[in-house]
């Protein structure tokens, strides 16, 4: 209740609702936004990584913008980075996506620079200052490219994207039979 009062008295809702589509219910704020901020505010003496995984187009980036703005207003040292910012640069991205059966320029597993992502997150977790890559999807006629770096010294880092936390099938496992992490196994109609 104290958290709710702090959010209401700070004007958080009025100053940040413009980041969310007008047609969307503000219930998302109470059910998702505030619980994430509550978790972020819990212990600011150590660095905490929060993963946010959801399907493309459902509002992860919009929520991330809201979280950063709300956290700034509340004095929380929170920053959001998208897994999309860790796409390979243009040349490597084109090589990685060449011949994919869907003909898409990015987004599939294999289009992200996972060593850079892991190295960056490990360095950040150890307390080091890191620079996060930025990716602009509008460059190269919508195929996208890296477009610079931004500084990150936040105590709380939210990593948003799809496939965040997903594990690949192990050798010998199949979608039909599942793996230990697929329970129950996926049916053909799924």
Predicted features by range, described:
Residues 57:
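Walker A (P-loop) phosphate-binding loop of P-loop NTPases
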Residues 31-43:
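Pre-Walker A adenine-sensing motif
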Residues 54:
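The Walker A (P-loop) glycine that initiates the GxxxxGKT/S ATP-binding motif of P-loop NTPases
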Residues 60:
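Conserved lysine of the Walker
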Residues 63, 67:
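Hydrophobic positions on the alpha1 helix immediately C-terminal to the Walker A/P-loop
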């Amino acid at each position: 209740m104290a958290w709710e009062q702090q959010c209401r008295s700070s004007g958080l809702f009025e100053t940040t609702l413009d980041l969310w589509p007008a047609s969307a219910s503000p219930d998302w704020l109470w059910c998702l936004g505030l619980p994430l901020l509550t978790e972020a505010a819990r212990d600011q003496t150590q660095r905490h990584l929060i993963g946010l995984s959801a399907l493309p187009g459902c509002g992860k980036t919009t929520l991330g913008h809201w979280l950063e703005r709300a956290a700034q207003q509340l004095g929380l040292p929170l920053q959001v980075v998208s897994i999309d910012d860790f796409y390979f640069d243009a040349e490597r991205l084109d090589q990685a996506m060449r011949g994919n059966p869907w003909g898409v320029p990015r987004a599939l597993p294999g289009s992200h620079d996972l060593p850079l992502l892991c190295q960056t997150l490990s360095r950040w977790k150890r307390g080091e200052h890191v620079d996060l890559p930025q990716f602009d999807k509008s460059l190269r006629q919508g195929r996208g490219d890296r477009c610079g770096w931004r500084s990150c010294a936040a105590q709380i880092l939210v990593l948003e994207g799809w496939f965040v936390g997903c594990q690949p099938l192990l050798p010998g496992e199949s979608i039909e039979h599942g793996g230990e992490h697929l329970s129950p196994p996926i049916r053909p109609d799924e």
